[in-house]
């Protein structure tokens, strides 16, 4: 802890000696070219009916459709059982794990319901039009079956360390699941690839975009170009880095205690605020809903037409709910349960709730009418959402700022754990290795706060979505055993309305 705080303090003092505007510009100028190059490589496109469609998006779309059909629409009939599993009392002391199922869900939600649920959705709608909102939610529905697979496999293939703590997630079910099928030659390299991508995804999507958009919102509500923080975004990043360092050193149990309180509170606050904006524009609801559906299938001002809108919506959906990335499976592996299928059902709620929150952002923006005369690049996503809230009540941007900070901090906390587990999977368990990762993670909070939003968005989507490549490959391979386990689970729990 002292090492992390001392390093951050030293960096803070050294940056004070440089003109603030130059610090932000220097960071963006020297980091952005590398992030742009990575994004272009991962989002390699092919042309379909005149639209450039990234191959990786098609990869995830096909997986969502396949697993939804393969598991017979579990996203629809499994929700009630998911709630039942979440509220039931623990089965006894035999349940192994670090955190309860609810704590695991809260931590996973805090990782997915980040600033992307506000800023990312706003940016996607400004680019893809109102129709993007439809495809963002559709992507969440398709992603639920994928999340079920990930959480179930994470618990099934988790490992218990010598100190009694749990390690699990895609790294482990890729390595051990394929080894069990005599495919170690494939499992080892894919697990290593996933761990590397998870670290990258944690540093970008779980870190840099969160602090970047939060810093922009704080600067926006404190005067914009006249704000005392204008040009000093790195100062806000340094403060956040210190706060995160204080939390993450408590490990998963400490993280779970924070997220269990933070996640329900911030979700409730955002939903109430969103409802006020929506109800204030009640007369516009029918026409706005009709516009969303119409633009989803017949967009009027989007490059690539319907395919352009679908790709923009699905791309944001994946970044928001993380289905296919396997990230949340890392914390689900730590859940106190003997039934891996049971935790899979609980995971359905995470993706569904994330989709609902994204809908609230979409509705607030579309219903308020702030999309008119909005041009991407001239305004950040969080500012667009802020304008929607401000259109109803003048001080709402302040409330949104509080929500944005809560969303960002919770995501920063959860992804520090995901990245840490990927780091120790590669380098081995050990206190020094954990501290090293935490230092690196906190330094990138400062870097992310000062970068241009366009560079952040591109590398965030690229690194997060790239995690789907090794993860989804193994989901296909291990799907038959999860289907058998699910059939057995349903039989034992007298859920005979679905036959496998």
Give the location of each predicted region:
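Transmembrane helix-loop junctions in multi-pass membrane proteins
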Residues: 70-75, 117-121, 203-215, 225, ...
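Flexible loop linkers connecting adjacent transmembrane helices
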Residues: 73-101, 123, 129-133, 145-186, ...
């Amino acid at each position: 802890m002292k090492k992390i705080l001392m390093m951050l303090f030293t960096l803070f003092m050294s940056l004070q000696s440089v003109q603030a505007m130059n610090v932000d510009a220097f960071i963006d100028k020297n980091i952005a070219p590398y992030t742009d190059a990575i994004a272009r490589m991962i989002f390699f496109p092919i042309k379909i009916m005149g639209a450039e469609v990234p191959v990786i998006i098609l990869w995830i779309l096909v997986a969502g459709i396949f697993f939804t059909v393969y598991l017979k629409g579990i996203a629809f009939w499994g929700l009630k059982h998911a709630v039942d599993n979440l509220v039931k009392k623990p089965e006894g002391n035999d349940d192994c794990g670090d955190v309860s199922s609810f704590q695991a869900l809260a931590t996973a939600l805090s990782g997915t319901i980040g600033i992307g649920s506000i800023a990312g959705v706003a940016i996607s709608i400004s680019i893809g039009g109102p129709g993007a909102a439809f495809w963002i939610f559709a992507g969440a529905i398709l992603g639920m079956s994928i999340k079920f697979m990930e959480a179930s496999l994470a618990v099934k293939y988790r490992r218990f360390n010598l100190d009694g703590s749990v390690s699990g997630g895609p790294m482990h079910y890729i390595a051990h699941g394929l080894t069990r099928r005599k495919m170690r030659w494939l499992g080892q390299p894919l697990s290593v690839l996933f761990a590397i991508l998870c670290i990258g995804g944690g540093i970008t999507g779980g870190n840099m975009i969160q602090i970047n958009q939060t810093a922009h919102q704080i600067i926006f509500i404190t005067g914009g170009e006249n704000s005392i923080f204008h040009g000093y975004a790195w100062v806000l990043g340094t403060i956040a880095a210190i706060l995160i360092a204080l939390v993450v050193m408590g490990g998963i149990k400490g993280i779970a205690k924070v997220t269990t309180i933070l996640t329900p509170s911030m979700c409730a606050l955002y939903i109430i605020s969103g409802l006020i904006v929506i109800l204030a524009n009640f007369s516009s609801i029918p026409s706005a809903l009709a516009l969303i559906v119409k633009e989803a299938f017949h967009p009027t001002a989007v490059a690539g037409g319907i395919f352009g809108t679908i790709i923009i919506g699905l791309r944001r959906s994946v970044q928001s709910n993380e289905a296919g990335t396997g990230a949340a499976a890392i914390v689900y592996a730590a859940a106190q349960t003997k039934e891996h299928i049971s935790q899979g059902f609980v995971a359905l709620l995470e993706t569904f709730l994330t989709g609902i929150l994204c809908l609230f952002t979409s509705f607030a923006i579309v219903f308020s009418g702030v999309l008119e005369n909005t041009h991407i690049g001239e305004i950040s996503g969080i500012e667009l959402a802020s304008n929607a809230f401000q259109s109803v009540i003048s001080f709402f941007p302040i409330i949104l700022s509080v929500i944005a900070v809560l969303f960002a901090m919770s995501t920063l906390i959860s992804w520090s754990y995901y990245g840490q587990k990927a780091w120790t999977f590669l380098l081995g368990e050990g206190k020094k290795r954990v501290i090293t990762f935490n230092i690196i993670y906190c330094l990138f909070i400062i870097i992310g706060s000062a970068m241009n939003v366009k560079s952040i968005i591109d590398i965030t989507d690229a690194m997060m979505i790239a995690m789907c490549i090794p993860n989804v490959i193994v989901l296909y391979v291990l799907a038959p055993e999860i289907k058998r386990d699910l059939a057995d689970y349903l039989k034992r729990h007298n859920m005979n309305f679905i036959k496998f």
